[in-house]
């Protein structure tokens, strides 16, 4: 039976790499897929991983009907044996419903990949709807690590290396930002709560300690 599967995790856990691997494995067996993405770091209409792999994809726009897009492709004689939706956290809840309809009405597997929570530890609406509708939710087993070495469970937004907790939910950035640019970093819960990024931890380590008073 076709399924709607949601592969979730923090940044740096290999979601897009797995999406590309699924695409490779199925296309190598002669299957035809359709790839959706939104706001990928490589630019519009691209699915990319941090390992440097990239392939073309359909850039999803606001209000776009994903079910209608698949049906239109089929009606023009195209094949769709599976659908991959990367950066699924950025999709609207209605678009997640449309992906579920692709599974139920067209008998096509849909593999969605996304981050569950934003930099404030709040669920993305698209991810929330996927958790509600998916036949399976798979938490990726490639663990991202906090700067302290603990398992990273939270996504932090940074400006110049300093964690921020206000702003729009969706701002495209990367983990390799230059000073004063918006970036993202994965943290363990403890350091997310303390708002301690790798940059602020380094700054604290380099700060001169108060010297002990010595007896004269």
Swiss-Prot record:
EC number: 2.7.1.21
Domain of life, source organism: Bacteria
Binding site for ATP: 9-16, 86-89
Annotated compartments: Cytoplasm
GO molecular function annotation: ATP binding; thymidine kinase activity
Chemical reaction(s) catalysed: thymidine + ATP = dTMP + ADP + H(+)
Keyword ATP-binding: yes
A biological process term (GO) from this entry: DNA biosynthetic process
Keywords: ATP-binding, Cytoplasm, DNA synthesis, Kinase, Nucleotide-binding, Transferase
Gene Ontology terms: cellular component: cytosol
Active site (UniProt): 87 (proton acceptor)
UniProt subunit comment: Homotetramer.
PANTHER family from the UniProt entry: THYMIDINE KINASE, THYMIDINE KINASE, CYTOSOLIC
Family named by the database record: Belongs to the thymidine kinase family.
The protein, known as: Thymidine kinase
Organism, scientific name: Streptomyces coelicolor (strain ATCC BAA-471 / A3(2) / M145)
